[in-house]
Design a protein with these regions (language model features):
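Flexible, small-/acidic-enriched active-site or ligand-binding loops
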Residues: 142-169
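Single conserved hydrophobic/aromatic residue that forms the stacking wall/gate
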Residues: 1-6, 10
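Hydrophobic, small-residue-rich alpha-helical packing segments that form membrane-like cores
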Residues: 84-85, 100
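A short, Trp-centered hydrophobic/proline-enriched beta-strand micro-motif
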Residues: 69-77
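A structural signal for short hydrophobic beta-strand segments in well-ordered beta-sheet cores
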Residues: 91-94
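A short core secondary-structure module
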Residues: 99, 103-149
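N-terminal glycine-rich flavin-associated loop
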Residues: 37-57, 83
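Glycine-rich loop at the start of a catalytic domain that most often binds anionic cofactors/ligands
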Residues: 13-30, 127
């Protein structure tokens, strides 16, 4: 839950984590008519990943603003010809002159149209085995070459999106 991820960050900073309070907060949110906060994917998935594997620069730049709701994240995993089979990813990232240049497509991307950032799995080593050579990139959603197409359902809602990458260029340290 959002509160447990935030609680973990607090504990790592020297505070005391309280799982009971975290569960009570999550339960009260669930009972209320308040819509869930946007950015849960960033809080629940990105923040723990950065805590374990991120650089100090990434932790400083992204964790606090994500927990405060200042950065909304979407997840770029599923692809049209791969679904959730991440070993079949076809979106490619090539390191050129200190930048990742990304080409490909993601699908079923929740909240992409509202997000400032995407954490995205991209094949960066094309000659590696199917289950290797995949990197986790942090992509600003306002980068030139990104096109977002909402997938409108029969109730006219667009909770999911297709995201296309054409010559999307991000710094090498966004890995």
């Amino acid at each position: 839950t959002i509160s447990s991820a935030a609680s973990d960050v607090y504990k790592r900073q020297g505070g005391e984590s309280d799982i009971i309070k975290s569960r009570i907060i999550a339960e009260e949110f669930a009972k209320s008519k308040i819509p869930p906060p946007m950015g849960g994917q960033g809080i629940d998935m990105l923040v723990p990943t950065l805590l374990e594997l991120g650089t100090e620069e990434q932790k400083q730049k992204y964790i606090k603003p994500t927990l405060h709701g200042e950065i909304i994240w979407c997840q770029g995993y599923s692809e049209p010809n791969a679904g959730s089979d991440l070993a079949s990813l076809q979106t490619k990232g090539e390191l050129i002159d200190g930048n990742w240049v990304i080409h490909g497509q993601k699908i079923w991307t929740s909240t992409a149209q509202y997000s400032q950032m995407m954490f995205c799995l991209v094949r960066t080593e094309p000659d590696a085995s199917k289950h290797a050579g995949i990197s986790y990139l942090l992509i600003p959603m306002d980068t030139p070459g990104i096109e977002i197409r909402p997938l409108v359902d029969m109730t006219l809602n667009a909770g999911f999106n297709e995201v296309f990458f054409t010559d999307v260029t991000i710094p090498e340290n966004n890995i």
